[in-house]
């Protein structure tokens, strides 16, 4: 684990950082780098709606190509599915020996969608939290833990540069963990698919369907399997599974011990292993690339199918009753 005393901020202060993208992480990195005294510019395509936001913050914005030409450290924070094209068209033609190419996620490098030249440092700085939290913690004098990894190190100074960058966005205040592009990418994808997004979503929808098909009102089913999920996750987030079990009733705890293994059994574990193998082998990324090359048709079809599930209809009606819940723009428009 690395902390403030392990990182030299002057290293990144002596470089010119170009941040490609201004989404959740892009804005947090750019603003915090600026506040740490680092020269920073943001690369966005012509016509991007985010250009005005960058300019309002007093940061210079230009096209990705021009920013890549100016910078000697380029942090790629565009969406995963856009990175390979941006690299090929805008970044690679402007890379110079001694430049550093940084990423917030290792997918494109690990699976060979981006192949940087050998004379460029390739590293990753990945905060383990959303951009708004990264920025808020930085402003409060704190930080969000970060992962760093060095995939290519022609100068032998890649780790020091990555640590310096992490310090500039507040990461070393909380702690920085050294990893590899392989481990960060594969664990991140597995967590998303098997548990956080895919697994949780299907568990919730299936629980809802079972209750409604058994004759219970959909409103009650929604409260029990989706709405109250936040209460449980918050307890786990604060103090782990033990804290959650301590906080719920004995009835809930006892029932969970008995029934949880009936839902998630050895067969589930084997299917999770199959998902991990698909990730490790590159099969998932091949499907991801095929979807993008096909115009996102598969993704759009899956979105439509999920949006039409009855739990979404029920949920929208119930959230109209919850003044304390922040409503997404799509529901309030």
Curated annotation (Swiss-Prot):
<dbReference type="GO" id="GO:0009099">
    <property type="term" value="P:L-valine biosynthetic process"/>
</dbReference>
<feature type="domain" description="KARI C-terminal knotted">
    <location>
        <begin position="180"/>
        <end position="325"/>
    </location>
</feature>
<dbReference type="GO" id="GO:0009097">
    <property type="term" value="P:isoleucine biosynthetic process"/>
</dbReference>
<dbReference type="GO" id="GO:0050661">
    <property type="term" value="F:NADP binding"/>
</dbReference>
<feature type="binding site">
    <location>
        <begin position="80"/>
        <end position="83"/>
    </location>
    <ligand>
        <name>NADP(+)</name>
    </ligand>
</feature>
<dbReference type="InterPro" id="IPR013023">
    <property type="entry name" value="KARI"/>
</dbReference>
<feature type="binding site">
    <location>
        <position position="48"/>
    </location>
    <ligand>
        <name>NADP(+)</name>
    </ligand>
</feature>
<comment type="pathway">
    <text>Amino-acid biosynthesis; L-isoleucine biosynthesis; L-isoleucine from 2-oxobutanoate: step 2/4.</text>
</comment>
<comment type="similarity">
    <text>Belongs to the ketol-acid reductoisomerase family.</text>
</comment>
<dbReference type="Pfam" id="PF07991">
    <property type="entry name" value="KARI_N"/>
</dbReference>
<feature type="binding site">
    <location>
        <position position="45"/>
    </location>
    <ligand>
        <name>NADP(+)</name>
    </ligand>
</feature>
<dbReference type="InterPro" id="IPR008927">
    <property type="entry name" value="6-PGluconate_DH-like_C_sf"/>
</dbReference>
<feature type="binding site">
    <location>
        <position position="228"/>
    </location>
    <ligand>
        <name>Mg(2+) 2</name>
    </ligand>
</feature>
<dbReference type="InterPro" id="IPR000506">
    <property type="entry name" value="KARI_C"/>
</dbReference>
<feature type="binding site">
    <location>
        <position position="188"/>
    </location>
    <ligand>
        <name>Mg(2+) 1</name>
    </ligand>
</feature>
<feature type="binding site">
    <location>
        <position position="192"/>
    </location>
    <ligand>
        <name>Mg(2+) 1</name>
    </ligand>
</feature>
<comment type="pathway">
    <text>Amino-acid biosynthesis; L-valine biosynthesis; L-valine from pyruvate: step 2/4.</text>
</comment>
<dbReference type="InterPro" id="IPR036291">
    <property type="entry name" value="NAD(P)-bd_dom_sf"/>
</dbReference>
<keyword id="KW-0521">NADP</keyword>
<keyword id="KW-0560">Oxidoreductase</keyword>
<keyword id="KW-0479">Metal-binding</keyword>
<dbReference type="Pfam" id="PF01450">
    <property type="entry name" value="KARI_C"/>
</dbReference>
<feature type="binding site">
    <location>
        <position position="249"/>
    </location>
    <ligand>
        <name>substrate</name>
    </ligand>
</feature>
<dbReference type="GO" id="GO:0004455">
    <property type="term" value="F:ketol-acid reductoisomerase activity"/>
</dbReference>
<feature type="binding site">
    <location>
        <position position="50"/>
    </location>
    <ligand>
        <name>NADP(+)</name>
    </ligand>
</feature>
<feature type="active site">
    <location>
        <position position="105"/>
    </location>
</feature>
<feature type="binding site">
    <location>
        <position position="131"/>
    </location>
    <ligand>
        <name>NADP(+)</name>
    </ligand>
</feature>
<keyword id="KW-0460">Magnesium</keyword>
<feature type="binding site">
    <location>
        <begin position="22"/>
        <end position="25"/>
    </location>
    <ligand>
        <name>NADP(+)</name>
    </ligand>
</feature>
<keyword id="KW-0100">Branched-chain amino acid biosynthesis</keyword>
<feature type="domain" description="KARI N-terminal Rossmann">
    <location>
        <begin position="1"/>
        <end position="179"/>
    </location>
</feature>
<dbReference type="InterPro" id="IPR014359">
    <property type="entry name" value="KARI_prok"/>
</dbReference>
<keyword id="KW-0028">Amino-acid biosynthesis</keyword>
<dbReference type="GO" id="GO:0005829">
    <property type="term" value="C:cytosol"/>
</dbReference>
<comment type="function">
    <text>Involved in the biosynthesis of branched-chain amino acids (BCAA). Catalyzes an alkyl-migration followed by a ketol-acid reduction of (S)-2-acetolactate (S2AL) to yield (R)-2,3-dihydroxy-isovalerate. In the isomerase reaction, S2AL is rearranged via a Mg-dependent methyl migration to produce 3-hydroxy-3-methyl-2-ketobutyrate (HMKB). In the reductase reaction, this 2-ketoacid undergoes a metal-dependent reduction by NADPH to yield (R)-2,3-dihydroxy-isovalerate.</text>
</comment>
<dbReference type="GO" id="GO:0000287">
    <property type="term" value="F:magnesium ion binding"/>
</dbReference>
<feature type="binding site">
    <location>
        <position position="188"/>
    </location>
    <ligand>
        <name>Mg(2+) 2</name>
    </ligand>
</feature>
<dbReference type="InterPro" id="IPR013116">
    <property type="entry name" value="KARI_N"/>
</dbReference>
<protein>
    <recommendedName>
        <fullName>Ketol-acid reductoisomerase (NADP(+))</fullName>
        <ecNumber>1.1.1.86</ecNumber>
    </recommendedName>
</protein>
<feature type="binding site">
    <location>
        <position position="224"/>
    </location>
    <ligand>
        <name>Mg(2+) 2</name>
    </ligand>
</feature>
């Amino acid at each position: 684990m690395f902390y403030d005393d392990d990182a030299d901020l002057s290293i990144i202060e002596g470089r010119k950082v170009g941040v490609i993208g201004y989404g959740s992480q892009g804005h947090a990195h750019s603003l915090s780098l600026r506040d740490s005294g680092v020269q920073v510019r943001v690369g966005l395509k012509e016509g991007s709606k985010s250009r005005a936001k960058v300019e309002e913050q007093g940061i210079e914005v230009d096209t990705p190509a021009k920013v890549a030409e100016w910078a000697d450290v380029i942090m790629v924070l565009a969406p995963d599915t856009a990175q390979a094209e941006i690299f090929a068209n805008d970044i690679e033609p402007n890379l110079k020996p001694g430049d550093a190419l940084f990423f917030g996620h290792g997918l494109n490098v690990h699976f060979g969608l981006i192949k940087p030249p050998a004379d460029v440092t390739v590293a990753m700085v990945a905060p383990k939290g959303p951009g708004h939290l990264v920025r808020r913690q930085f402003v409060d004098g704190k930080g969000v833990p970060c992962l760093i990894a060095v995939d290519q190190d022609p100068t032998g100074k890649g780790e020091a540069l990555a640590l310096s960058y992490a310090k500039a966005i507040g990461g070393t205040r909380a702690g920085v963990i050294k990893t590899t592009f392989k481990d960060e990418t594969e664990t991140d994808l597995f967590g998303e698919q098997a548990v956080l997004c895919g697994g949780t979503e299907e568990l919730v929808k299936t629980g809802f369907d079972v209750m409604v098909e058994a004759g219970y009102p959909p409103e009650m089913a929604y409260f029990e399997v989706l709405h109250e999920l936040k209460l449980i996750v918050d307890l786990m987030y604060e103090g782990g599974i033990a804290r959650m079990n301590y906080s719920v009733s004995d009835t809930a705890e006892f029932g969970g011990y008995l029934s949880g293994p009936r839902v998630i059994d050895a067969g589930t574990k084997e299917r999770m292993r199959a998902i991990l193998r698909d990730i490790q082998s590159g099969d998932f990324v091949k499907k991801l690339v095929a979807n993008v090359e096909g115009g996102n048709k598969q993704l759009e079809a899956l979105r439509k199918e999920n949006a039409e599930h009855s739990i979404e209809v029920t949920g929208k009606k119930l959230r109209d009753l919850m003044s304390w819940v922040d409503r997404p723009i799509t529901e309030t428009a």
